[in-house]
Amino acid sequence: MLVCKKLLLPFAFACCGSLFAQNIQNPVLPGVADAGVMKYNGKYYIGGVRTNGDFYVSDDLVHWGKPIHVVSMDNDWTRGSGAGDDQIHANDMFYLNGDFHLYWSVNYWGKDKHAVHIVHAQSKDALGAYTEPNKKTWMDNRIDPKIFRDDDGQLYMYMVRFTDGNTIWGRKMKNPAEFAGEPVCQFASLPDTWETMDNRVAEGPWVMKYRGRYYMMYNANHTSTEWGNYQLGVAEADSPLGFQNGNKYSYPVVGCNQTQLEEKQVDLLRYGRTYAVSYT
C-alpha cells in the first residue's frame, strides 16, 4: 500500500560545512515514492512510483525541475491495466561504458491479470528515451530491483520475491541485461522481532561497500497506516551475496513515525566526500 509519498533528505554521514548543514524544508519532492537516484556529470536524476516514466533533475538534491518523460512501457508481455506507465515502480539506474541503464518493477495486482516483474531498459542519454532491448519477456519475476557494482566491476542485482512474506534475494549478473547463475536468498523478516510487528515484509534492499565490508539497508513491516510500523534495518556481510539473518543488526537504524507515516525506501549516493541518505 502506498501512503504519504515524499522525497526526504533526513541526514548525511560526516557531513560538515555542506548543503546538509542547512535547514532543509522537507519534503523536497512531494509525490515521489520508492525512488532511485543517479548522479551523472554533476546532476542528480530521480524516478520512482507515481513518476509515470518521468525523471526529475536537480543540481543539489533539493531544488528539482519539472518532470521529463524518459521511458514508456513498450513490450510484448504486459497487458491491460498492468501495461500503463503508471505501473513503472521502484526505479534504479546507473551509467556503464557509454550506456545508461534503467530498471523498474511492474507491480500491478488487478482483475484482468497481475504482473509482478522486473524490467530493464537502456539509453545513450541520461534523459532517454530508454528502450527495452528484449521486449519478449521480463528480467525476473520479482520487484524492487537495485544494482550494486563491486570494486572488481562485478554487478549484482538485489530484489524482492513474494515467498515467505516479502523476501530479499541477490543474483550475480553477466552484464546489465543478463544474469549469471541462480538467485540466492538473502533473508526474510524474523518472527518475534522488530521486523514482524505486523506482516512479514523485507523489501527495498540497497547495498554499499565500506572498508571491505558489505552493508545492506532494507525495510521491514507493512507500510499501511493501520499499523505504522515500517522501519529501516541494516545487515553486514563479508561478501555481496553473504547477507543472512545472522548478520543483521538487532535494531532498526531508522524508526517509524506513528504520527505521520512515511514509507522509507532508502537510496544512498555520494555528495562530495560524504554519503547523503534520502528516502521516500
Task: Annotate the PLM regions.
Residues 21-279:
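Carbohydrate-active catalytic/glycan-binding domains of CAZyme proteins
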Residues 1-22:
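Bacterial Sec-dependent N-terminal signal peptides
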